[in-house]
Design a protein with these regions (language model features):
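Extended, non-catalytic scaffold segments that flank or surround catalytic motifs
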Residues: 15-18, 32, 154-155, 162
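Alpha-helical cap/lid subdomain in secreted, periplasmic
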Residues: 3-5, 27, 85-231, 235-254
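Acidic/histidine-rich helix-loop elements
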Residues: 41-50, 71-80, 111-120
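A generic, residue-level signal for flexible/boundary positions that often mark functional hotspots
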Residues: 18, 34, 217-219
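Short, solvent-exposed mixed-charge patches
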Residues: 256-258
Length: 258
């Protein structure tokens, strides 16, 4: 067996191994980190039909995207930071990741029973800026989302604003920091107005006593969504990701309703 033959065989084997390594190397996933409150977060089956909009949102991406829903009920920007929920996310961020940021419900809660979560407008602004800057420092992409509107109508059937001050702050921060923002507050309210009072109730945790075994006393919740409402909010977010021309939009897929 001559040396040239052996040399060619070695080259062929090396090339084959290189190709195999290239083929089996796992593709780096785009990670989407979701931080926010109870309107976004995950709920277990024992809470059905209560659904955060982050739950249906996560299924509308192809296999190259990994959605990490880190939202938690009752959290404001302040408590999300003070409870050391943000720092591990910030430390884990990699280039090309996304951070979807929706806070406001609990930040604005001044009632005595919610004083543990209240955040002053100035601190709210500074906390949003911190999320943005730390995300950008990792060459990841922050996306602000104004707090989804609660269901509230006046006696004439007009859908009312429920987050005026904190939504305005977030929109201003987005403009000043030059980051994309999805105005879910306005878009959800526009949806309620289009649907009207009675149809809007079908989006929320509105249950009569005895209607659902998990909620024997019923529920008159104007803040949290059922499966239908969560899906509607997720559809708004996905549509805006496309309209903002985020690279993430290329990985959105159509899922048929079950």
């Amino acid at each position: 067996m001559n040396k040239k033959y052996i040399f060619n065989r070695v080259l062929l084997l090396a090339g084959t191994i290189a190709c195999m390594c290239f083929i089996i190397a796992p593709q780096k996933k785009i990670k989407v980190w979701m931080i926010g409150d109870s309107t976004m977060c995950y709920y277990g089956p024992e809470r059905t039909p209560l659904t955060g909009w982050g739950m249906p949102f996560a299924v509308f991406f192809d296999s190259t995207v990994q959605v990490n829903n880190m939202a938690r009920g009752g959290r404001s920007t302040r408590t999300f930071i003070s409870e050391i929920r943000w720092q591990p996310i910030s430390d884990s961020l990699q280039e090309g990741d996304y951070v979807l940021i929706q806070f406001g419900h609990n930040d604005e809660a001044k009632e005595e029973k919610y004083k543990d979560r209240y955040t002053t407008p100035e601190d709210y602004r500074n906390n949003l800026i911190r999320f943005i800057r730390e995300t950008k420092n990792k060459k990841a992409f922050p996306v602000l989302i104004t707090p989804v509107s609660r269901m509230r109508f006046d006696k004439e059937g007009k859908a009312l604003e429920t987050h005026t001050e904190y939504t305005a702050i977030m929109l201003e921060v987005a403009r000043q920091q030059n980051v994309p923002v999805i105005d879910l507050d306005k878009e959800s309210r526009d949806l309620y107005q289009k649907l009207g009072v009675e149809a809007t109730k079908l989006l929320f945790m509105q249950l009569e006593p005895g209607e659902h075994p998990f909620y024997p006393q019923g529920s008159k919740d104007n803040t949290h969504f059922n499966e239908l409402g969560a899906r509607k909010m997720a559809q708004i977010i996905l549509a805006d990701i496309r309209s903002l021309k985020l690279e993430l939009a290329q990985h959105v897929v159509v899922r048929n309703a079950k």
